[in-house]
Amino acid sequence: MELDLLTAISPIDGRYRGKTDALAAYFSEFALIKYRVQVEVEYFITLCELPLPQLKGVDKGVFETLRNIYRNFSEADAGRIKEIESVTNHDVKAVEYFLKEEFDKLGGMDDYKEFIHFGLTSQDINNTSIPLSVKEALEQVYYPQIEELIAQLRTYAEEWANIPMLAKTHGQPASPTRLGKEVMVFVYRLERQLAALKACPLTAKFGGATGNYNAHHVAYPEYDWKAFGNRFVAEKLGLE
């Protein structure tokens, strides 16, 4: 079968695609691959900023060019990563090899490309990419729509402030109330729930195979890798 709205396995991608389409940029496989590329690129840049001794020669002017790899990430790029994965049988390793190809295209980066993914395990990439996708989906799609809903309900509550209506208790007619007040109840509830959601920390896992930066410490014991990891996650990804 050809994939369309009727043949999709999940109703999220089928029946309700019109409602969920905006989330494809955050939760599709294409999006996950793109976020993995972003994390790998930002990690490499952060190593250069440290800098590691072997990365002192990297021109800072190339950083924005490197960022354009994920900013301009295309379906063709994702397709290339899937081609590499068909050989590696490893999705994150395929991202690393793709980035090495992109470094080759830039020229002058051949001596540095082995530091892509230096000291990391796959879950360092997955457990930063996925919360980053959740963070950006909330900030760019979910929060704005909920805030728009709250604003519209508030408008109705003010417009209908003096419209009387019969209230009920236990399903039975009771004392009167006002329509605007009842709508305002939902404004209040939504505002509290939105504030609670925004207060939830979006956390990442980052620290090597077992969370101890073992490979990092063996290679470069003079650096504070725990501080490096915390700074990378907080400043470059906006996570905790």
Question: Predicted segment positions?
Answer:
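A helix-coil-helix interface module used to build multimeric assemblies
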Residues: M1-H216, Y220-A234
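Short, intrinsically disordered, charge-balanced linker/junction segments flanking boundaries
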Residues: K236-E240
